[in-house]
Every structure is written in C-alpha cells, then in structure tokens.
Amino acid sequence: MKIKFQKYQGTGNDFVLIDNRSKVFPKDNTTFISQLCDRRFGIGCDGLILLENSEISDFKMCYYNADGKEGSLCGNGARCTVAFADFLKLIDNKTTFEASDGMHTAIIANEIIYLQMHDVNKIETFDKHSFLDTGSPHHVQMVEDLKTFDVFAIGKKIREGAPYNKTGTNVNFVEQISNNQFAIRTYERGVEDETLSCGTG
C-alpha cells in the first residue's frame, strides 16, 4: 500500500498527517498506525492525524496516539492539521473544524496559527496536584528542580495509577521560575513517554 503523507511539528510535538477524504486509510488497524509512528522502524512521530471530510465544518481531524489508538484532542496536532488543510487549499485564513471534543475555530495570520480551545469549566484541586480537562485530561503537579526530575518514571506511575488506571491521563510537571514564568515537562499517555511539548497541557 502506498500512502502519501506529510510530516509536521508544533513546538517539537511531531505528527504524520494524511489526507483521508477518500476514506482509504485503514484507521481501525492500530498495529499499522503504531508501526508508522515507531521512531526506529516506521516514519516516527508522537501521533498520526487523518484529515477527513465533515458534514458540519471545513474538515474533520482524527487523532491517533503513537500506540495506534484513537486519542483525545491534541492542541499542537490541531494547529498542524490547520496548516495541512491550508496546504491542501481547503480553507482560507479562518476555519472551523471538527475534532474529538467538538468544534474548534482557528485563524492563520502572518504564518502563525491561532487555535481557539474550549473553556475549562472545572479544576479539581488536591493536596499535591490539580486535575483539569482541556479536551484532554491533565494531572498537574508542582515540582522543584524540573531539569533533573524523573518525568518518565514518575509520570508513568501517575498515568497508570489510581484514580486514572487504564484510561490514563497526561501528566504535567511544573516548576515556577518567577512570578509569571513557569517551566513544564509532560508525560503523554498514548505516546507513553515525555514529549517535547504538549498543546493542551
């Protein structure tokens, strides 16, 4: 099978993008998708995105994590999908598109893509962390010395542990640098590793 694809990245979060308006891509084949995402034996990426037709907007974004399973909203992936739709000449400078969490609008201005996210209606605060859903679930925890923090081991433990268990969550570790500056490192579910950035976190 020959598949045309493009590779995009948003602040280091990288994706394979495929025009699937003809519905030929085997999107139910999780093994195949995970093989394409594999960095050693495939193309290599944090996630795979299919651009499909939508009956209610300019296009539909279907996002798959590197494990091959369909994922929740990916903010950087959404910006890359808008850039891909622009490349395909499907949109002008403003677009409305469909994603897993509903409708989104985006604007392209001076080659920068501005994406409107959904408002966060609820933030749950606990002793050592907070939890919120921005279109994807996020466990947010303040830490010290973020540079040496073991994001992989601790992130994996939180992602797989209670109360998230099998469903899992993204895990953000945050260090406050100054009054209005923060550093963030993220363990992403589905990728099951730290990524260079996370658009929803």
Regions found by a protein language model. Name each.
Residues 104, 118, 129, 138-139:
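Histidine (H) residue identity feature
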Residues 1-110, 140-200:
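A glycine-rich beta-to-alpha transition motif near the start of alpha/beta enzyme domains, typified by
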Residues 115-128, 153-156:
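Active-site glycine-rich loop that binds ribose-phosphate moieties when present
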Residues 132:
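Short glycine/Trp-rich loop-beta-loop segment that forms part of the substrate-binding cleft
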